[in-house]
Each structure stands twice: as C-alpha cells, then as structure tokens.
C-alpha cells in the first residue's frame, strides 16, 4: 500500500491540486482503518506494539522507495520529499539507512507482528531491533548536532524525534518481557564443567574479541584526529570516509568505541565465567547495533554520494571489505551461539534442583 500512496501524493503535490491531495489523504486514512479493522476483527491483539510495528512497517517501505529513487531505479514516487526533507537523507549515510530500514527493519517488523498475532514470544528479535534502532538514533541525533547539517534542522526533525520517543518506549516494553529459555539442569551442569579448552568455539570467540577491541578503539582514535602516523596512514589509505564533514562516520566510530569497547570486555568475562545470564540478551542488542552500523559505514564508504576524496581507494577496497565484513559477521555468530546454546550462561534455579 505504501507504493501507490507515495506515487499519488507525489503527483498531487506536483500538480498543486489541494483538493485532490486532501481527498487522497482522507482516502488513505479510510483505507488503512478499514484494512486494520478487517484483519483484526476476530481477535484484536492486546499488545500495543502490534499497532506500532504495523505503522513502522508501512514507513519502512516508504524508506525503501526513497532509497530506490535516490539511485534512479524508480522515479516520481518521493521526488517532492527528497527536495524538502532534512538534508541528511541525501547523504550517503542517510541513503544506506533508507535501505537498511526498508529491508532489514521491514522484515523484523513483519516477524514481530506475526509473533504477536500468533501469541509467540518476540523478545529475541525485538532485542536485535533495539540494538539497531539505538545505534541509528544516537548517530542521527549527534551527527545532526555536530555535523555540517546541524543548522538545517527542519520540522521533519521534530517528527523524527517523535518516532524516536515512541521507539524508546517500545524498547522498554521489549526489555520487560520475560525470557522464554527453559534449560535442563543436567545440561547446565554439564556445560559449566567444561573448561575453555573443551569449548573450542568459545576459545575462537575469545581470540577474536581481543583484536576486535583493539580495532574498535583504534578507529575511535582515528575519529578523534589522533596525530599518530598509524592513524594518519590508515585514514588516508583505507578509510578516508571517517573525515567526511557530515560527521556521521566520526560519530559512529566514537559511539562504537564508547559502547562496543566495553561490550567486548564484558563478553570476554561472560565467555570465561559460567552463569552470566545477561550474555544472550547483551549479544542480541550488540549484534543488531553493529550490523546496522557496519552496513551503513561500508555502504557509505563506497557510495557515489560520498565525495570522491572521502571514498575508499580502489586498491584498498579488498582489505577494507575483508576487515569490516569479518568485524560485522563474527559478532552475529557469537550471538547465534549464545542464544541457541545458552546452557553455559544459565544458572540452575531451586525449582530445577528439586526436580
């Protein structure tokens, strides 16, 4: 429904037809109301997040349309919006955010809507979305505050702040949901008895976390304009995008250093000491945040909307892609391990002991 609505609204605005635009708006609201009533007339979901995510899914498709029109794949759907919207939407970072929201977030919203409809738990996928949303929101707000577009904040920025406020409320709703894990006592005891040498996968993750922490801190220092020759050479050869005046990449590296850095230390502790029940939730939030951040960073570093002097040089692209893709994927595997084999991180409850 988002596609025809975007096309009609864009056409009405360009034709300066106020009556037609008003009619289209009323018709859209009526169609959405009737559709929602028809779909949930038998049993309306009691969870208010059902309606929040339904609206978000609608706007995710709009964001996908924005990304496609920016790449000239389609035309005439959101032309007026691209001219009047906040300037950040036309940056490489905003461009990649549109694709992320239109693809990944759209899928996540559909999964959570389906889980609510069927009465299933959506806490895990919800925590992944929480991490992705928080990273996007923090970089957006701080990037607008310190970047070159800080003086171009318009009414749509206030609308975006409303979206962030509702999403923060949704985050608290997700965190308040109980965990659905049910692990046998024997499995927990068996996992706790294994030493690190008998957990080769965890050993590999620990070996990864140490250089990942160093890489995270190093890029944060680069974003802070460290005068070290290593930092200067790295910026010039591999990631000149960190110097982009929009400030989004610089803010993203600083956020990663301040939050991902401590996470890697905490994750090391969680993999070494049994009974850290918070480990699966923490990896879900972090993997969602890192996936969103790295997708935006990698895409914007190579995108044609980034000025040529700030793009990754052609001869450095293989190394850049290898390092950043590994830095993105390994935390996803760690999250998978913690969520689907959580016995090592669980504590036996008194009820399980009595059984």
Residue map of PLM features:
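Eukaryotic polytopic
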Residues: 24-34, 39-223, 250-355
């Amino acid at each position: 429904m988002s596609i025809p609505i975007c096309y009609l609204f864009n056409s009405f605005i360009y034709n300066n037809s106020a009556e037609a635009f008003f009619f289209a708006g009323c018709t859209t609201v009526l169609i959405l109301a009737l559709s929602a009533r028809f779909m949930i007339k038998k049993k309306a979901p009691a969870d208010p997040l059902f309606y929040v995510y339904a609206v978000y899914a609608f706007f995710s498709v709009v964001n996908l349309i924005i990304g496609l029109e920016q790449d000239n794949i389609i035309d005439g759907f959101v032309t007026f919006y691209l001219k009047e919207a906040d300037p950040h939407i036309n940056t490489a970072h905003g461009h990649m955010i549109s694709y992320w929201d239109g693809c990944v977030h759209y899928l996540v919203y559909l999964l959570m809507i389906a889980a609510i409809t069927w009465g299933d738990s959506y806490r895990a996928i919800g925590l992944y979305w929480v991490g992705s949303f928080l990273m996007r929101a923090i970089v957006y707000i701080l990037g607008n505050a310190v970047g070159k577009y800080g003086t171009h904040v318009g009414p749509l920025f206030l609308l975006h702040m409303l979206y962030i406020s509702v999403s923060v409320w949704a985050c608290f709703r997700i965190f308040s949901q109980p965990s659905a894990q049910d692990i046998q006592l024997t499995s927990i005891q068996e996992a706790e008895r294994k030493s690190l040498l008998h957990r080769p996968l965890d050993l590999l993750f620990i070996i990864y976390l140490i250089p990942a922490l160093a890489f995270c801190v190093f890029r944060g220092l680069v974003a802070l304009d460290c005068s070290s020759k290593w930092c200067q050479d790295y910026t010039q050869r591999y990631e000149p995008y960190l110097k982009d005046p929009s400030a989004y990449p610089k803010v993203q590296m600083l956020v990663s250093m301040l939050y991902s850095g401590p996470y890697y230390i905490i994750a090391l502790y969680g993999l070494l000491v049994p009974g850290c029940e918070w480990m699966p939730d923490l990896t879900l939030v972090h993997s969602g945040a890192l996936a969103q951040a790295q997708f935006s960073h990698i895409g914007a570093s190579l995108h044609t909307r980034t000025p040529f002097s700030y793009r990754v040089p052609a001869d450095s692209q293989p190394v850049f892609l290898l390092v950043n893709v590994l830095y993105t994927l390994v935390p996803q595997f760690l999250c998978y391990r913690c969520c689907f084999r959580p016995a090592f991180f669980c504590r036996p409850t008194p009820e399980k002991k009595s059984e």
